[in-house]
Amino acid sequence: MKVLWFAVNPSLYDAHRNGEHNGGGWIASLEKIIRTSDNIRLGVAFEHPDPIFKKEIDGVCYYPIRVKPGLRRRIYASEKDKIIIADCLKVIEDFKPDIIHVFGSEWGFGLVEKYVDIPVVIHMQGSLPPYVNASYPPGYNFFTQWKTSHYNPIVLLKRRFVWSRNDNYKVAREIDILKHCRYVMGRTNWDYNITRLYAPDSQYYHCNEALRPVFFNPPKTWTFRQRKRIQLLSVGSCSMVKGMDLLLKTAKLLKDHTDFDFEWLIAGPTGSFSFFEKNERTPHDAVNIKFLGTLSAEDLAVQLAEADIYVHTAYIDNSPNSLCEAQIILSLIHISEPTRRRGI
C-alpha cells in the first residue's frame, strides 16, 4: 500500500543533517514506526526551501515543496495556498498513493480533497475556529501588543490589512476542509465534537499519537524526593495561548504570598517572554523562573525525571505531546474537565 503524508514539518527528512528535531515529534515518531512495516510504501510532502522535487532516503520518498518568493505569497495565506495546492497535486500525480494522510485540519494541505478521488483522511491536531475565539489571555488584546511595539503604525496597518485577513481566511479554510472531508482521525472528545459539528457525515477513527521513543525508556527514572525546594517544570512556547502570563502571575503569587520554596523551569523557546514580563511588570528571575532553552528529547526526559511536578499552563491545547511525554515519566498536576477528575 502506498501512503502519502502531507505534513506540517519535514519529519525525518532533515534528521541526517540536523540531528533529531524537537517540534512536531509525533510525525517523526510515527514515521519511525511506519518504516518497520514491509507492506507500506511511504511518501512525505512538506514545505521546505530545498529546490528539488523529490528525494528518497531509507526507503521513504520525500517531497520538499518550495514556495517561490513573491510579496503576496509571503503576506497572504490565500495566495500561498494557490501555489501549495498546485504543487501538492503534482506530488500526488507522481507518487500515485492509495491513501492520503493530511496532518492538521488547520493547514492548507487538506484542500487537496476537492481535486482527487483518492481517499483522504484528515488527522486532527488543533482547530482554528475555537482558537481565534480565545486569541488573547485575560487582560491582553491587540492594543497590548501595539503598546509593546511603541505604537508603531506599521503594526496597526498589518493588523488591519494582513493579520485579520489571514485569520479570517484560515478559519474559513479549515471549516471548508472539514465540510468536504470523508474520513477523519482524532484522539480526544474535542476532536470528535468539532468534526461532528463541521463534518457530521464523515467517518471518524480514533488514532492516538506516537510519542518520541526516548520517553518510553528514559535515561533517568523519576523518584519521589523529599527536599525543601520544589522543582516545577513547564514545556512550551511564548505564543498568547500557551499561558506564559498565567505562569508569571502564579509564580509571583507563590513568591509574594506563600512560604512555598520553589524553582520553576521552562523548557522551550523563550525569546518573546519579555513581552509578558513587561505587561505583568514581573521579571522572570525575580519570581524563581529559570529558562532552559530548547532541549533535545534526551535532555528533556532527564529534566522531567529531575522535576517534582510538571505544570501545563496553556489556555488551549489538544492533548499536547509535551503533556503526554510528561505523564510517562513523572507525577503532575493536570485538570481534566471532560472527565471531571482533578488532582495530582
Give each language-model segment a name.
Residues 333-344:
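Single conserved hydrophobic/aromatic residue that forms the stacking wall/gate
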Residues 92, 294-295, 302-307:
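Short alpha-helical donor nucleotide-sugar binding micro-motif in glycosyltransferases
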